[in-house]
Amino acid sequence: TLHQTKKGLVAALEHGRRECRGQYIARLDADDIALPGRLDHQIAALDTDPSLAAVGGRATLFTDHGPVPRGMQYYIDWINNLDDPHREILVESPLLHPAVTFRATHVEHIGGYRSGEVPEDYDLWLRLVADGFRIANVAHEVVSIRDHSSRLTRTDSRYSRTAFDSCRRNFLQKTALLRPRRIVLWAGVRGGRPWLRWLKTGGHQVIAVIDITKSIVRSGVPVLPPAALPDLDLDILLVAVGARGARGQIRNELATLRPDLVEGHNWWALL
């Protein structure tokens, strides 16, 4: 057991990480339960693929009192059915922090956890991938997570929508948007406005907004229906539509309208 004065979560994570001497480091919150076989499955994955930096897995969720909140269960269901964390890395954090085992050298290479107004785990996964490393989930339940109202994800500003968007934008700036691009933004008014503003401020040419509304122009950018996509000369498509089920519908439409676009390569869902 390691002891230090109270300095916050990131300081504790970094203190523990630096004291570790093994090749791999496994995370677990004190009130969660590691399931039998967790380390066997994750270490086997890491041993097999040296490019893997971090490996998570499936999870179950429980509470001490009352039902599991619907939003958290929806997130766990998404994780448990996630085929490719890289493909949907900008939707949400694709690895559950308490379920992760990571390669010590790769995390050290990018400087470990960072403090600041960002979710420290999501920020870490994104920086690993931006630096060329891979992440994955094993197809096994590896942890049972205790959900409660005092979780930092519900009470700390580092886990706000704004903080997550900051991580997404930092990732895009280091990867797909490293230089000015011709971008199409598929988004409604509410979800799209901050992204449209950010893209234009960054010097990117937003050639169209895709929406089913009857708007003609939004912030100087033409608003077009999905049927217009085949005729657009674009580099990157960003999708900021948060309605439940919309992501799958849009994915299906894109397979027909723009089969040349590959999710996680030149188009991303942001919600």
Task: Annotate the PLM regions.
Residues 1-156:
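Nucleotide-sugar donor-binding/catalytic module of glycosyltransferases
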Residues 56-58, 185-186, 211, 240:
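Short beta-strand segments
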Residues 60, 191, 215:
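Conserved Rossmann-like nucleotide-cofactor binding loop
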Residues 140-141, 145-148, 153-179:
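Catalytic core of nucleotide-sugar-dependent glycosyltransferases
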Residues 180-199:
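Glycine-rich adenosine-cofactor-binding loop
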Residues 204-218:
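NAD(P)-binding Rossmann-fold cofactor-contacting core
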Residues 214-271:
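Phosphate-bearing ligand-interacting subdomains
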